Structures are given as C-alpha cells and as structure tokens.
Amino acid sequence: MRISKPSLRSTSIQCYLCFLLNSHLITEAGIHVFVWGCISAGLPKTEASWHDVIYDLKRIENLIQSIHIDATLYTESDVHPNCKITAMKCFLLELRVILHESRNEDIHETITNLIILANSSLNSNGNVTESGCKECEELEEKSIAEFLQSFVHIVQMFINTS
C-alpha cells in the first residue's frame, strides 16, 4: 500500500547512517547529528502535500479512463477564496462516492492516499470557520472528469496561498 508520509518518499535515512559510520564523528556529537537528522526526516512537510494531491488526482483521472464509472458528483466549479476549505471538504466527501462505485484496487489505494494527504494539509490550517459558503448538496452535479478538473483547480488555490 502506498499510504505513507510524502516527506519520506525522497528522504533517505541511509545517508545519515552512512555519514555517521564513515566520518570521524563517532562521538556524542556525531550521534546527536544522526538522531536529529532522523527526527527531521520524519517531520511532516505539508508544503509538498498539495503537490502530491495533484499527482494523485492525475493518477485517478488516468485510472478512471480505463474503467467506466457512470456517476455525477457535487462539484464546486467557481470557488470563492473565502470558501476554499468548505469546498475542499465537499470534494473529499465526494471522492468517497468514487470509492464506492469503483472496484479497482489502484483507485481505492490512490483515493485513500489522497484523502489522507489532503486532510493532513487541511489540519495544518487549523479550525478555520467559513461563513456564507454553499453546502455540498447545493452544488451542481457534474461528471467525474469535470469533478476532477475542478478539484485540481481548488488544490492549486491552496498551493498559491501557502
């Protein structure tokens, strides 16, 4: 399963271990460098999460082309910047419809990973309350292709403001 911290995808703990073993820092200071390096490798890096969400959305788009899912999803096509968190929560809820409609394991894995990444990035925004925003059920129902395009657009809004 591909669900993992996106920050650990490119971080290699072996580099820290090699540095420690091949250097003359086999002292208390060297051990501190190694321990702090390992700790920093495991810290969440939310600035990369939205890029990973877009990657997963593109992957879902490609996977859905190979199967037929005839569903319409509540889609926010014109997101007001003051309602982007509310809209994102609606998009994440609607992704579960695709999970329910699809029996494809790759789609299930990718959507589950995307939901985890997006929720962890949303949690970094704190408990922001938005008022005057549409409820999910008030949104227009659109095809999966249009839904995914709108989803990418709102994720880009999060990237541009971070």
UniProtKB/Swiss-Prot annotation:
Give residue ranges for the propeptide.
Answer: 30-48
**Signal peptide range:** 1-29
Q: Which residues are glycosylated?
A: N119, N127
Task: Give the intrachain disulfide bonds.
Answer: C83-C133, C90-C136
Q: Mind telling me which InterPro entries this protein's record contains? A: 4_helix_cytokine-like_core (IPR009079), IL-15 (IPR020439), IL-15/IL-21_fam (IPR003443), IL-15_mml (IPR020466)
Positions in coiled-coil regions: none
Subcellular locations according to the entry: Secreted
Gene Ontology biological-process annotations: cell maturation; extrathymic T cell selection; immune response; interleukin-15-mediated signaling pathway; lymph node development; macrophage differentiation; natural killer cell differentiation; natural killer cell proliferation
This protein's record includes keyword GTP-binding: no
Report the protein's function.
Answer: Cytokine that plays a major role in the development of inflammatory and protective immune responses to microbial invaders and parasites by modulating immune cells of both the innate and adaptive immune systems. Stimulates the proliferation of natural killer cells, T-cells and B-cells and promotes the secretion of several cytokines. In monocytes, induces the production of IL8 and monocyte chemotactic protein 1/CCL2, two chemokines that attract neutrophils and monocytes respectively to sites of infection.
By what name is this protein known? Interleukin-15
